Amino acid sequence: MKEFKVLMFGPQRVGKTSVLSSMLKQFKSETAITDINISLTPDEITKDVVEAKIKDLKEIFDKKASDKSDDRWTIDTNKTPAKEKYRFIMSVAGAADDIGITFTDIPGEWLREQSKKTANGEIDNVTEKELQKELQESSVIIVAIDTPHLMEENGMYHDACNFGGHVNRLIQQSSGEKMCPKLVLFVPLKCEKYYHEGRMDEVNKAVKDKYKMAIASMSKGEKAENYMVAITPIITLGGVVFDDFGRDSEGYVEIITDNAMSFSKPEAAFYKLYDKAPKFAPKFCEQPLLYILKFILDITDFEPPKKASRSFIKEVFKPTKGMKSIYNKIMGKGDKIEIGFEDLLLLNPQILIFGRAMQYVFTPEAQNNIQEAVLKLKVSGSGYEVLQNPFEK
């Protein structure tokens, strides 16, 4: 079974688990009313988490509908204490095998911890090492963004809540290394207020401004050939909107300060029911999964151009018989390949090997089924934008 890893990082309590739960629910709803032959099944542990979360989200509306004593409240009070993994099996009709998709949710504190280095320049921080390992092994990176902290008070509390500087640093570091092709999604969450007010273009612009260093690092020179990048906002609840940060008697935002970590952020964020539609009505939650399918589909057929001479590559890489054997094993399979090993190295080897492997999993029938699903991909409107996709023909 081909394994596919997705890394999610962002602030605690931003609602990453809620999005996964709604993603599964909405994807099942979309496929149930169409002829798309793709299923997504959680393992038993993930299933329990997802079902419990959906129940909790629906109860928000049930409780508030019956209790009018408090018209606003805080949400997402339970933070993830440690790294969590959520596993799904994706089955596509006609595919030679299923695809295992594992979502890894990184605790918010990991992003804030400063990396220390030894005298030899090596990272001396357990969580930093583990985070770097997850970054390298993951094909998809989801940057979850708390939208009220991004937008309110002129974005004053964005860095403290969303770790904007740390996210920029991590992506800049990872994009500087030779890696397999990656899909990077910037996913603003809790967007309901701005969605209902018709301000999603403002959210899009704020994301591009606050994460401009990370975006720039993935779009320069040869690095641009490894990354598909998009902004994909999600309406997590639909009928709940941000109201305001907690304020003192004089109207100033009440903040909490951590001198050790050097940050200050609002002590509380309050939400209220959206009067016009006070019900659980998530939107776009299936889009990250559709983007993953689009990414897989594009990678499967990707053929990048040559960039250097064969003699130069032979001199630099000095291919061994063992390397050629691995190459032949992956690229052969009875196909007539009109490309030599040195030519492979002229291209992006990770992309070609990954794409060729996916071709054996996804037969033409399976690719057609994925293509049907990808037709529902949202690429514009409501703050959506594909910033770059070097793999698309």
Explain the meaning of each model-derived region:
Residues 1-111:
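Conserved G1/Walker A P-loop phosphate-binding module
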Residues 2, 15, 136-137, 180:
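Residue-level preference for short coil/turn positions at secondary-structure junctions
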Residues 74-139, 149-156, 160, 164-169:
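Switch II of P-loop NTPase G domains
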Residues 2-3, 7-8, 28, 259-276, ...:
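C-terminal non-catalytic interaction/localization modules
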Residues 5, 99-101, 140, 183, ...:
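Structural motif
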